[in-house]
Amino acid sequence: GLQQKNDHIWVHNCDFFYGDAGSDADQVKGDGALDTKTSTYVTHSYNHFWDNGKCNLQGMKSESTENYITYHHNWYDHSDSRHPRIRTCSVHIYNNYYDGNAKYGVGVTMGASAFVENNYFRNCNYPMLISKQGSDDLSGGTFSGENGGVIKACGNYITGAKAYTTYQQDPTGFDAYEVSNAKETVPSSVKAKQGGTTYNNFDTSSVMYSYTADSPEEAKEKVMARAGRVDGGDLKWTFDNSVDDASYAVNEALKAAIVAYKDSIVAIGSGFTDNNDPVVTTVTTSVKSTTTTVTTTQPQQTTTTTTSTVPVVGSDVIYVSPNGGGDGKSMNSPTDVLTAIKSVPAGGTIYLLDGTYKFSETILIKENNSGTAGKYKTISAYPGAKVKFDFSGQAVAGANRGFVLDGAYWHFYGFEIANAGDNGMLLSGDNNIIEMMIFNGNQDTGLQLSRYNTSYASVAEWPTNNLIKNCTSKNNCDDATMENADGFAAKLTCGEGNVFDGCMSYNNS
């Protein structure tokens, strides 16, 4: 959950299953699946909740500000309650699919204002509840006697509900104030029975964002197609509506499937395999086949195939090692990386052999050191090698980057850049590919995209058309202030056409 002082957060396309059982009887499926407390400007969308007992607690008793939260296109799939359960906050709830919910849908307490719009409620026992009035009184009270709030409802489709009462039907025992137009305001005469609070009409004020709500039927179709992980994830389950709609007990068969589940993830970005090695595939060069296969067969035994890597040779391949001093033409005679960077031709490959490359100064690839559109200059970890560039010898200073890539048409692949005195990499050139890289423990942003030449004043001169693909940036932190380092940063002097695809950033200051 989002526990304290978060703002401008988006949680989307997640699957939520059972948690560990708590000590209370109503926590047999775990406690809150996705709670949000003391946070504002938060959106929860396209998430899939699988038979959770308590989905979304929104707000704490101690909150006093009108935190603004949105829930849209979530699939509450046979989950029981708290979709969401709101204290004090201003919450927009639209285009969600409530699919067989044994207890209730939306609940408001402690002066909360909720706009519930164009949702699809199928067999949701009590679609909307206000504490201590209406259907909440009929159900014996759900919210520990807390004061009520006000719900504004518009355009919802409700079928199979046990009870739902509008203000127009009962102005003191209502579950929601129903409007026919989303722009209609709720008059101040509409008040919670216990607590006497009114609706704050946040949804028609200047704080409201622009959006277009789907019809409930369209929302249902979108939610079933798109909520949760891609293609519904790799755990498949079909509920029995005749049983599961009304049941709030643990579905033992579903629980067994969850407990037995084994994911098939190989890597997320880079740096996430079992041994934390970068995931490496062979880099394509103009050199022909780099492997041979030897097959040995013994009578009445299984055929065994072994594959060995044959060293690549050729004028466009350069080998380097941490202490290399050779000519770089073979693995047995590697050169140093600075020599290789200066001499590698367009279309050539620098293979980094296993080890830690220690530097106390920035490695600068100059603007005039570039490949071409058809012939990238590649610098790559040798297949299977674990390669790390360690810049811990640098002092902490704004100019002390690890790598500065000011050239064009370079392809960086499959190694780690760590402990620089500023950015791990400043990417200032054009048409480069940075792939499967790890930026770890640098004193400023792991990878920063911005100009290097400060005299370049126009967008046309700034870095353009770079692809940062499946990279990981972690643990980057400026020790002095603990607040300036990002995982990735596209700065003000960043050009057009740059793409971050499949990258992961975490634990940065």
Predicted segments — roles?
Residues 1, 332-335, 370-423, 477:
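Right-handed parallel beta-helix/beta-spiral solenoid domain characteristic of secreted/periplasmic
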Residues 3, 12, 17, 37, ...:
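Feature marks extracellular polysaccharide-active and adherence modules
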Residues 121-282:
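Long, contiguous C-terminal flanking segments immediately downstream of a protein's structured core
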Residues 1-3, 23-36, 51-63, 78-82, ...:
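Extracellular beta-strand/beta-solenoid scaffold signature
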Residues 3-6, 11, 29, 38-39, ...:
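Parallel beta-helix/beta-solenoid
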Residues 281-309:
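Extracellular mucin-like PTS domains
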